């Protein structure tokens, strides 16, 4: 029995070595844990897209000829739009739904380096409509003919990016948020049973998707209809009542301007709110 002890001990050692080798091999064959992935960069901000168009100018050196227009802003100076404005072709005007939108524009030096001022852009507000001219071809005078995207800019704005002698320049443009001071403003025109409300000084999208009105004698909102440009109308009799507006911009943000118009209002008055789209 004593002679068998060394042999048994040797056998146990060999067994332990074999088991250890098997465990190491199994560990090597097992799949390794996944390597932690680095977080992907945020895709919340989409790079701005630049689109091609052309631009001409009108209105004179002081832009006085751009007053009025198909959006209904009348005096662009007093409304805060100034000389940084443009008339849009049919492809961009969208039957007036684009009124108030803002566009950053740069002269396209790749297409016309001799007529571009380098390294500058200008931001303009859509305040007018550039009608088509069917008597002229789209590439020779009929610049605003569909489906061409075209900006007929106020001359001072155009001259920020282009050389005057060119007359027309190729441009790159993109929609940008509108920056405004103060709140949204409402100007009431029309007459009894026809309330025509001009909405101005709209920030962010610059334009309005839908609008409702409510008189102080009711608790029901009544939808308004875009009449032309930035003017919305209601056929209800609201004279002598305080007026509230519910306005939704093109991004879907809704603001309620409750009793923004006092009961003693008159046609032709403008009422400035303290609320603004963000």
Swiss-Prot record:
Coiled-coil-forming residues are: none
Known Gene3D superfamilies for this protein? Expansin, cellulose-binding-like domain (2.60.40.760), RlpA-like domain (2.40.40.10)
- Enumerate the InterPro entries for this protein: Expan_Lol_pI, Expansin, Expansin/allergen_DPBB_dom, Expansin_CBD, Expansin_CBD_sf, RlpA-like_DPBB, RlpA-like_sf
Localization per Swiss-Prot or TrEMBL: Secreted, Cell wall; Membrane
Name the source's superkingdom: Eukaryota
* Expressing tissues: Expressed in roots.
Sequence ranges assigned to domain Expansin-like EG45 in this UniProt record: 68-183
The alphabetical list of record keywords is: Cell wall, Cell wall biogenesis/degradation, Glycoprotein, Membrane, Secreted, Signal
An annotated GO cellular component of this protein is: extracellular region
CDD domains listed in its UniProt record: DPBB_EXPA_N
Q: Which SMART domains match?
A: DPBB_1
PROSITE patterns, per the entry: EXPANSIN_CBD (PS50843), EXPANSIN_EG45 (PS50842)
Name the SUPFAM superfamilies on file. Barwin-like endoglucanases, PHL pollen allergen
Give GO BP annotations, semicolon-separated. Answer: plant-type cell wall loosening
- Function per UniProt: May cause loosening and extension of plant cell walls by disrupting non-covalent bonding between cellulose microfibrils and matrix glucans. No enzymatic activity has been found. May be required for rapid internodal elongation in deepwater rice during submergence.
Annotated family: Belongs to the expansin family. Expansin A subfamily.
Tell me what this protein is called. Answer: Expansin-A24
Q: Which organism is it from?
A: Oryza sativa subsp. japonica (Rice)
């Amino acid at each position: 029995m004593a002679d068998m002890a060394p042999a048994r001990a040797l056998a146990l050692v060999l067994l332990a070595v074999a088991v250890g080798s098997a465990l190491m091999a199994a560990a090597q064959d097992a799949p390794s844990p996944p390597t932690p992935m680095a977080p992907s960069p945020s895709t919340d901000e989409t790079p701005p897209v630049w689109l091609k168009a052309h631009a001409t100018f009108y209105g004179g050196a002081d832009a006085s000829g751009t007053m009025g227009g198909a959006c209904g802003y009348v005096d662009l100076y007093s409304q805060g739009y100034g000389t940084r404005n443009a008339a849009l072709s049919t492809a961009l005007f969208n039957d007036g739904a684009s009124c108030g939108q803002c566009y950053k524009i740069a002269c396209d030096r790749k297409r016309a380096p001799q007529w571009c001022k380098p390294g500058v852009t200008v931001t303009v507000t859509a305040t007018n409509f550039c009608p088509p001219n069917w008597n002229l071809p789209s590439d020779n005078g009929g610049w605003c003919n569909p489906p061409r995207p075209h900006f007929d800019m106020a001359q001072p704005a155009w001259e920020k990016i282009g050389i005057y002698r060119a007359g027309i320049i190729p441009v790159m443009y993109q929609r940008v948020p509108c920056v405004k001071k103060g709140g949204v403003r409402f100007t009431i025109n029309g007459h009894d049973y026809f309330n025509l409300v001009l909405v101005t000084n709209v920030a962010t999208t610059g334009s309005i998707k839908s609008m409702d009105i409510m008189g102080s004698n009711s608790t029901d909102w009544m939808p308004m209809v875009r009449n032309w440009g930035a003017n919305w109308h209601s056929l209800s009799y609201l004279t002598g009542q305080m007026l509230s507006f519910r306005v939704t911009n093109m991004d879907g943000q809704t603001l309620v301007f409750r009793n923004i118009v006092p009961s003693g209002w008159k046609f032709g008055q403008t009422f400035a709110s303290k609320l603004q789209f963000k």
